[in-house]
From Swiss-Prot:
Gene Ontology MF terms in the entry: magnesium ion binding; orotate phosphoribosyltransferase activity
Gene Ontology CC: cytoplasm
Reaction catalysed by this enzyme: orotidine 5'-phosphate + diphosphate = orotate + 5-phospho-alpha-D-ribose 1-diphosphate
Xref: HAMAP family: PyrE
Official protein name in the record: Orotate phosphoribosyltransferase
Keyword line: Glycosyltransferase, Magnesium, Pyrimidine biosynthesis, Transferase
Family designation: Belongs to the purine/pyrimidine phosphoribosyltransferase family. PyrE subfamily.
NCBIfam families in alphabetical order: pyrE
Species assigned in the record: Stenotrophomonas maltophilia (strain R551-3)
Binding site for orotate: 34-35, 128, 156
Amino acid sequence: MSDHRHRFLQLALTADALRFGQFTLKSGRLSPYFFNAGRFDSGSLLSQLGACYSDAIDATGIKYDVVFGPAYKGIPLATAMACELAQRGRELPLSFNRKEAKAHGEGGQLIGADMNGKRVLIVDDVITAGTAIREALGIIRDAGGIPAGIVVALDRQEIASDTDHRSAAQAVAEEAGIPVIAVATLADLLDFASGNPELVGYRQPLEAYRAQYGVRSIR
């Protein structure tokens, strides 16, 4: 497992962003684990998370000019990544959107850097149904930006539905024609659990969940 994947999963565990047990998802599925990026709620945690995101995207070679964070959780994540990149000597513009357009002041739906004619990297927590990411893609294109890729914290690698055996991330990547990168995946989580004595007992429920809902490439 790549170092940034292991660091991210350990960080998520420390922050209580990654929990094990029984959780009912929005889809109605009963999951043995749950990820909540909202638990990265301090400067230190966000700084370390920004480093994990930066390492993950650096490993891909994707070229981009602007970092974009979809409202709401994507905003602090994109900001943390942009700050980390600046620490590494790469100063990049940052942009994000409001959920509702503002009618006064500077107005509009977008805040931050101009994206017109620029290659834009979307930074978010997860892709569940893909609705928020598709909305972000539309916002970027409407602003004249060119979507270059998407990076998320965790890819659950599970099928979107009984009729679509792609994951939500795979579906978005195919529809948009851009790569979707994950800092870590369900496969990484299984490896991580196997190597952690405190988590090894959760491996069997994780394996069973993957066997039932995992995309075919990892079953």
